[in-house]
């Protein structure tokens, strides 16, 4: 089995589904006359890296030299996301494409989530030869690759990325999504959560 270097000494590349987590904070003081829902007066907006971006900033917080790669739209949300990622010390190596950046918007009041709205599509159509070659070039610069899959299409051709890592002898860690773990064949380590593991083993 491939030895995984200590993260404290390794350059780690996170490839996966990058998204923006947006929080609207405010006070819910009354019920709307239009429908039985609270009216929230928004007082603060908080933008954070989500998905693979969250994984990358958590690694950077542990002192790991981290690069983030994936796909985003060529839009204002991508600009905000890049700023939030780089502020945490993560190198931004994310490709823009014609899709819209994924945004997950949560409306919060008194530390309670009232609703979540997802603005997203699939990036599958944009995982082309240029993105795969770009990813292979990044793989050559790093000691460990972490694939962060949220089933949004960025890792639609995950087998190609795993093969590229194996050819270079680079360890591949996978944070999987769904029950088809066969697509991650060749990875050094797969780290499902309990529900994902139970779905696979029955």
Which role fits each region the language model picked out?
Residues 33-40:
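Peri-catalytic substrate-binding/gating loops that frame the active-site cleft of hydrolases
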Residues 1-29, 41-202:
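Ribokinase/PfkB-type carbohydrate-kinase core domain
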């Amino acid at each position: 089995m491939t030895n995984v270097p200590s993260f404290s000494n390794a350059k780690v590349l996170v490839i996966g589904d990058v998204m923006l987590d947006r929080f609207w904070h405010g006070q819910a003081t009354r019920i709307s006359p239009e429908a039985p829902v609270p009216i929230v007066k928004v007082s603060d907006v908080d933008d954070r890296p989500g998905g693979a971006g969250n994984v990358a900033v958590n690694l950077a917080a542990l002192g790991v030299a981290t690069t983030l790669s994936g796909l985003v739209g060529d839009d204002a949300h991508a600009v905000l996301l890049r700023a939030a990622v780089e502020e945490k010390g993560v190198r931004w190596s994310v490709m823009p494409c014609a899709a819209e950046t994924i945004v997950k918007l949560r409306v919060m009041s008194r530390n309670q989530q009232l609703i979540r709205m997802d603005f997203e599509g699939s990036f599958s159509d944009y995982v082309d030869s240029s993105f795969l070659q770009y990813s292979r070039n990044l793989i050559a610069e790093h000691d460990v690759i972490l694939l962060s899959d949220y089933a949004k299409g960025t890792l639609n051709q995950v087998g190609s990325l795993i093969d590229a890592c194996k050819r270079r002898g680079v360890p591949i860690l996978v944070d999987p999504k769904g029950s088809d773990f066969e697509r991650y064949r060749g990875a050094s380590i797969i780290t499902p959560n309990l529900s994902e593991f139970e779905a696979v083993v029955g």
